[in-house]
Amino acid sequence: MVAVIIKGNEVAEKKRAQLKEEVVKLKEQGIVPGLAVILVGEDPASRSYVKGKEKGCEQVGIYSELIEFPETITEERLLAEIDRLNGDDRINGILVQLPLPKHIEEKAIIERISPEKDVDGFHPISVGRMMTGQDTFLPCTPHGIVELVKETNLDISGKHVVVIGRSNIVGKPVGQLFLNENATVTYCHSKTQNMKELTKLADILIVAVGRPKMVTADYIKEGAVVIDVGVNRLETGKLCGDVDFDNVLDVAGYITPVPKGVGPMTITMLLHNTVESAKRAGVVCK
C-alpha cells in the first residue's frame, strides 16, 4: 500500500477560490475585508512570510496594509499602533509578525489586539473560546490541519489522534480542535517515555516538533493519516519535514508532503478568518 498524498497546495487553492467568491459578494454589499500586518525589523524569514500573506490577500481580493517598523521601535509605540488599528473600521484583522525583538514582550502585544480582529487566534480570549467550543477565530495552522484531515473524508469522531509536540502555536491547539471534533487525543513530547507505542495507536498522527525526519515507519499504524507540520532545511538546502516521507510512504494511508503540505493552508486560514471578521463587522466602506 502506498499512501495517498494530501496536496495542501491544491486544497488551499480550492479554498482560496471559494473565499474570492465570498469577497466579491461582500464587496457588492459595500464591505471590503481588510488585513493589517505589522512587521518589525529586517528578518528575512519574517519578510518572506509577510510577502506570502500580501500575495494571498491580493489573490482573494482582501485589502492589505503592511506597516513596517525598525527593530529599535519601543513597545509603547507598537502598542499605540495596535490601538490605532483596533479603531480603524477598514481593518478587520490585525497580525503582528513574530518573533519580535527581545525588548518587546510578545504577550503584551498579542493581548492588545482586539479579540474581534485577532485573526491569528492567539489572544487569550480567542484561546479560551476555542477551548470551550465557542465560535471564535481558530489558530491558522491547527485549523488548516483539521481541514486537510477532512479532505480524506475520514470521520474524525471517535478516532484516536496522537499529537507529537506541545507548542502553544500548533501542538496544544490542534489537539483541542480534534477534541472538539469528538476525537480521542493523546499528546507526546520530549518527556514521553513510550512514544512509539502511543503513535502506533494513532488513526491520525500530527507531527510538529522541528526535528528533521524524526518519525519513521516504525512510529506509524498501517493506514494512518500522517500530517507533517515540520519545515526543516537540510545542509543541502533542501526542505524536509519531521516525518521521513519516503520511509513512511508505504505504511501510512494518507500523508502530507513538505513543502506544499500544511504550509499553504496556514495563510489560507488567515484569509478565511479575515473574511469572517469582515462578515461579523458588516461595516460598509465608503
Swiss-Prot record:
Listed InterPro entries: Aminoacid_DH-like_N_sf (IPR046346), NAD(P)-bd_dom_sf (IPR036291), THF_DH/CycHdrlase (IPR000672), THF_DH/CycHdrlase_cat_dom (IPR020630), THF_DH/CycHdrlase_CS (IPR020867), THF_DH/CycHdrlase_NAD-bd_dom (IPR020631)
BP GO terms, sorted: L-histidine biosynthetic process; methionine biosynthetic process; purine nucleotide biosynthetic process; tetrahydrofolate interconversion
EC number: 1.5.1.5, 3.5.4.9
Positions of NADP(+) binding: 165-167, 190, 231
Reactions catalysed, as given in the entry: (6R)-5,10-methylene-5,6,7,8-tetrahydrofolate + NADP(+) = (6R)-5,10-methenyltetrahydrofolate + NADPH; (6R)-5,10-methenyltetrahydrofolate + H2O = (6R)-10-formyltetrahydrofolate + H(+)
Ranges in a coiled coil: none
Keywords for this protein: Amino-acid biosynthesis, Histidine biosynthesis, Hydrolase, Methionine biosynthesis, Multifunctional enzyme, NADP, One-carbon metabolism, Oxidoreductase, Purine biosynthesis
Known pathway: One-carbon metabolism; tetrahydrofolate interconversion
Record GO terms (molecular function): methenyltetrahydrofolate cyclohydrolase activity; methylenetetrahydrofolate dehydrogenase (NADP+) activity
One cellular component term from this protein's GO annotations in UniProt: cytosol
Subunit structure of this chain's protein: Homodimer.
Family label: Belongs to the tetrahydrofolate dehydrogenase/cyclohydrolase family.
Function: Catalyzes the oxidation of 5,10-methylenetetrahydrofolate to 5,10-methenyltetrahydrofolate and then the hydrolysis of 5,10-methenyltetrahydrofolate to 10-formyltetrahydrofolate.
Protein name (Swiss-Prot/TrEMBL): Bifunctional protein FolD
Gene: folD
